[in-house]
Amino acid sequence: AEFVTWAGELNILVNNAGILFSGPFEQTEISAHHKTMSINVNGVLNGCHAALPYLKQANFARIINLSSASAIYGQADLVSYSASKFAVRGITEGLDTEWQKYGIRVLDVMPLFVQTAMVQDMQAKSIQNMGVHLTAEDVAHHVFQRAVAKDTALTATHQAVGAKAKLLFQLSKISPQFLNRLTNLYLSK
């Protein structure tokens, strides 16, 4: 409400809050798993819920959620983070369909690992094996593109960010589940 009073309108919301704990599931405190789910999922729910009345009034309205390539297939050593990003993916899909009647598109971006403080010193093998090549600016560029793009029936709800994430996302659509599992087992060793 304060922002709308200042700016006059809210027509784009970017949900970007998130935390990550890495390590074997059983060695991570249950409170860390709960905190990850709470912040990463409830932050998106809260942002969407609070913004809806204002977005409904806008001529052009869009929500961009920061999901993750970890929502393509569950990741060892990042279990609660991956689960939270699957939830963001589900929220994005559900609201994109539900809020079409208001003219609101709900989209996401799904980057692989990004060069931020969040992934420094992380122990997950998939981070070590895949590397951290994206910058915050790379992701911001994709968020901006999603925010201002003309809406067409061909505008995909999800956009993988980075060559590796795009490849994994496309392969996950066409490859058998056992192959997805074997690929992730390989990446997590």
Please identify what each model-predicted range represents.
Residues 68:
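Residue(s) in the substrate-gating loop at a strand-loop-helix junction
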Residues 73, 94-105:
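Active-site-adjacent segment of SDR/Rossmann-fold oxidoreductases
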